[in-house]
Swiss-Prot record:
CDD domains: ACD_sHsps-like (cd06464). Belongs to the small heat shock protein (HSP20) family. It comes from Dictyostelium discoideum (Social amoeba). Induction: Down-regulated by Pseudomonas aeruginosa, PAO1 strain and PA14 strain infection. Keywords: Stress response. The keyword Transmembrane helix does not apply. Residues 130-143 have a biased composition (Basic and acidic residues). Residues 89-100 have a biased composition (Polar residues). It holds the Pfam family HSP20. InterPro entries: A-crystallin/Hsp20_dom, HSP20-like_chaperone, HspG1-11-like. This is Small heat shock protein hspG9. PROSITE patterns: SHSP. The gene is hspG9.
Amino acid sequence: MATIFDILNTLNNNNFKNCKRQCPINKSNKTIIDIIPSMDVTMTNDKLIIETELAGISKDDIEIDIKDSILTIQGEKKKNLNKQQQQLVSEKSSTSPSTLDSKEDEPSIEEFEDDIKPKSATSTTTTTTKENKDDENKTKSSDKKFISERSFGNFKRYLDLTKVLYQLDLNSINTQFENGLLTITINKKLHYSNTIKININ
């Protein structure tokens, strides 16, 4: 006879297969899964403990829910930008003009005539612009990656609790997230049974 540890071990090892076979898929909104986190599941005399490695992820980017006896842990591991990258992103967002503003800011015929410059001034401006672009390209190309092994993107992990759900008190769920380790603790019911006796009227 299989023990509770055998059941949980089977569920944990076959997690990806269970996900494909049992979990409902929303075809209209498919999400590409980039990371499948590692998980440890332990059953003690009075509780179920689920530990999931989520290093480098903020707790605000983690979602946990139980639906149709399936525990789902999902979210996104975002890539942190350095100061130079953040500055470039903010500059692009602040300098990109909108279509409406560009039409309103177009100069009139009189303004065109007043702003006509001699060819020498125009060529000087063009040269300066090219120099600025060259400086920007040099700055961008100064960052060189020698090793890139870290993974970023969406993560999701399923755990099918169907065979042990009758033992668990779902109102006692407790979660902790510390040092990249998510710990979910679910207490077992004081009195439980997988058999329901039905009286005949």
